[in-house]
A protein has these predicted regions:
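N-terminal leader/targeting and accessory segments in enzymes
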Residues: 1-108, 468
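Phosphate-binding loop of NTP-binding sites
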Residues: 32, 36, 74-80, 87-231, ...
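Short beta-strand "acidic-cap" motif of Rossmann-like dinucleotide-binding folds
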Residues: 40-45, 150, 172, 249, ...
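Short internal beta-strands
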Residues: 40-48, 227-231, 360-361, 380-389
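Short beta-strands and strand-loop turn motifs
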Residues: 43-45, 192-194, 230, 439-444
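Beta-strand->loop->alpha-helix junctions that form or flank phosphate-binding loops
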Residues: 46, 70-71, 107-111, 244-264, ...
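C-terminal helical cap/extension that packs against the catalytic core
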Residues: 57-61, 371-437
Length: 468
C-alpha cells in the first residue's frame, strides 16, 4: 500500500536546503533519509572536526553538501528552508529563533516520523515512569499479536523504518519535553504519567514552559484521540477538559468521579469497571510500578485482552537501569537505578525498596530543588554517599530536612568509583538487625557532569560492583 504522506513528503522535500542541528543517534539516520529524497543537507554540530566520531564523519561526508562544526555551529542559520533540530538543543539557542522568523520551518526527526507514520501511535511522557510504562504498553500490544515498534527516548530511531510500516502496525514512543516542545503533532493515544519539576536547566521559562511542552503530547489530537492522565498528580489532573478526544484517568485510589478510569480497589486493578488483575500479579514491585501499569492498562484498554495484560504483568521483569539487581557481595545487595535522574524518581525507588539503604546520589545540576529528596533520605536511608556537581546542594537538603536530628552520615567523594567503594564499606558497617542491606545507585540527577547518559553511568556502576 502506498503511503500517501511519504509520497507527498518526497515531492516537497526535493531540493530543499536543510540544516540538521546535532549529530546524535536520531539525526544520523534522518540525514540518510532526507538525502534519499533529494534534500540538500548541511550538518551542524558542536563537536570540532578533529573530535568527531568516525561513523558520524562518514555520514556527513557521504550525505551532506556541507558541514559546520565547533562552537559556531548555530550561527548563520538564515537561508535554510528547514531546520531539523536535535532534542537536546533548545529552540531559542544560537540563531534558531531568528531563522524561524525569517521563514525557516523548525522540526525534528521525531516530528517528521510521526507525520509520515501510517500506523497508530501511542506516546508516553511524564517526569517519571516513562520508560517502564512505554515498555509495558509495547509488551502488552505484542502479547495481543500486534506488530509493534518502540522508539523515541528508548530503542532505536524509527524514521528509516517508516517505509516498511503499514496501517495495521503499532508504534509506542517515549517522548521527552525536549522532543515535545516544538512539536505540532500528537500521537493517537497520549499518556502522561506524572509531572514534577525537571529539566529546568533546559527550559528557560521554568516549570510553566516545561508543562506547556508536555501538553503538546495531546494538544494536536482530534476527537478520536485518547488522553490518559494521572488523577493523583495535581498538574496532570488539571488537564481535564483541555483534551479534544477521549479522557481516561488512572489512580491508585478508589475513584468515584464520573470519568473513565483505571484504578486500584482492595488490591485489585479495574479499568472502566472491568477487573483486569491483582496488584500482586505485577512482578516488578513498588506502588510506582503499579501506577505505571495503571497508565499502560488505560492506554491499551479495548485493544488488548485483559488476560494478555495479566500475562505481561506476571512475566515482565523490568527495564535495565531501573532498580536493576546487580549482585550480592558479602551479604550486601547492589541495585542499579541509574535512571533515577530526578528526586521524585529516586524517592519512589526508596519508598518501594525497604530494608537498610546506602544511597549513592549526585550528578549534573538540572536546577531543580532537592527538599523532598532530603526528607526522603532522612526517612528511608541509613547512609548517603555523594559525588558530582550537586553534592553540596543535596547535603544541604538532607541536613535542612533533619527535623529529628538523626544526623544521617553524609559522605562526599571525588569520583564515581570512590563513591561505589565507599558505599560498599559503609554498608558493611551497618547493623542489619535482621533486615537486608542494599547499596542503591539512584542519583536524583542527570549524568552529564561525568557520563554521556544514564546508561553509561549504570554500566560503569555494574562494572565496579562486579569487580568488588
Amino acid at each position: 500500500m502506498i503511503n500517501e504522506q511519504i509520497e507527498l513528503f518526497k515531492a516537497t522535500i526535493k531540493g530543499k536546503k536543510i540544516a540538521v542541528l546535532g549529530l546524535g543517534i536520531s539525526n544520523l539516520p534522518a540525514i540518510k533519509f532526507l538525502h534519499k529524497f533529494g534534500a540538500v543537507i548541511t550538518a551542524r554540530d558542536r563537536t570540532p572536526y578533529d573530535e568527531l566520531d568516525n561513523d558520524k564523519l562518514e555520514v556527513v561526508k557521504a550525505y551532506c553538501m556541507d558541514f559546520v562544526l565547533g562552537d559556531g555551529y548555530l550561527d548563520n542559520l538564515d537561508g535554510y528552508d528547514i531546520i531539523v533540530k536535535s532534542p537536546g538543543i533548545p529552540p531559542y539557542a544560537g540563531q534558531i529563533e531568528s531563522a524561524v522568523k525569517n521563514g525557516a520551518h523548525l522540526t525534528s526527526e521525531m516530528e517528521i516520523f510521526m507525520t509520515l507514520c501510517p500506523c497508530k501511535i501511542v506516546g508516553v511522557t511524564g517526569s517519571d515512569g516513562k520508560t517502564t510504562t512505554t515498555t509495558v504498553i509495547y509488551e502488552m500490544l505484542k502479547a495481543e499479536g500486534k506488530k509493534v515498534y518502540v522508539g523515541g527516548n528508548i530503542g532505536s530511531p524509527l524514521l528509516d523504518k517508516v517505509e516498511q510500516m503499514n496501517e495495521n502496525d503499532w508504534v509506542v514512543l517515549e517522548l521527552s519535553s525536549f522532543q515535545l516542545q516544538t512539536m505540532k503533532i500528537s500521537p493517537d493515544i497520549a499518556v502522561i504519567t506524572n509531572l514534577s519539576p525537571n529539566h529546568l536547566d533546559y527550559h528557560k521559562g521554568g516549570m510553566a514552559e516545561y508543562i506547556n511542552a508536555k501538553t503538546n503530547i495531546f494538544n494536536y489530537q482530534n476527537e478520536n484521540g485518547k488522553l490518559v492522565i494521572n488523577a493523583d498528580n495535581d498538574v496532570t489532573s488539571s488537564f481535564e477538559g483541555k483534551q479534544k478526544g477521549n479522557l481516561i484517568f488512572f489512580t491508585r485510589r478508589d475513584y468515584n468521579k464520573d470519568i473513565a478510569c483505571s484504578q486500584i480497589k482492595d488490591g485489585k486493578i479495574y479499568c472502566c469497571g472491568e477487573y483486569i488483575m491483582d496488584v500482586s500479579d505485577i512482578r516488578i514491585k513498588g506502588m510506582h510500578n503499579a501506577e505505571n501499569y495503571l497508565a499502560a492498562i488505560a492506554a491499551v484498554y479495548g485493544i488488548v485482552d485483559p488476560e494478555n495484560m495479566r500475562n505481561v504483568a506476571r512475566t515482565f521483569g523490568g527495564v535495565r537501569h531501573r532498580m536493576q539487581y546487580v549482585r550480592t557481595v558479602d551479604g550486601i545487595e547492589f541495585y542499579n537505578d541509574s535512571i533515577g535522574s530526578s528526586p521524585s524518581r529516586t524517592i519512589a525507588g526508596l519508598v518501594a525498596h525497604g530494608g537498610k539503604i546506602v544511597l549513592i546520589a549526585g550528578g549534573y545540576d538540572k536546577k531543580i530543588p532537592f527538599d523532598t529528596l532530603g526528607e526522603a533520605v532522612n526517612r528511608y536511608v541509613s547512609v548517603i554517599v555523594l559525588c558530582g556537581n550537586t553534592s553540596d546542594k543535596i547535603e544541604k537538603a538532607v541536613k535542612d530536612a533533619d527535623k529529628d536530628k538523626k544526623d544521617i552520615p553524609i559522605i562526599k567523594t571525588d569520583d564515581f568509583e570512590s563513591a561505589v567503594k565507599t558505599a560498599f564499606a559503609a554498608a558493611k558497617g551497618i547493623d542489619a538487625d535482621g533486615e537486608r542491606v542494599s547499596v542503591i545507585l539512584s542519583p536524583a540527577c542527570a549524568s552529564f557532569d561525568m557520563f554521556k547518559n544514564f546508561e553509561q553511568r549504570g554500566d560503569k556502576f555494574i562494572e565496579i560492583v562486579n569487580s568488588l
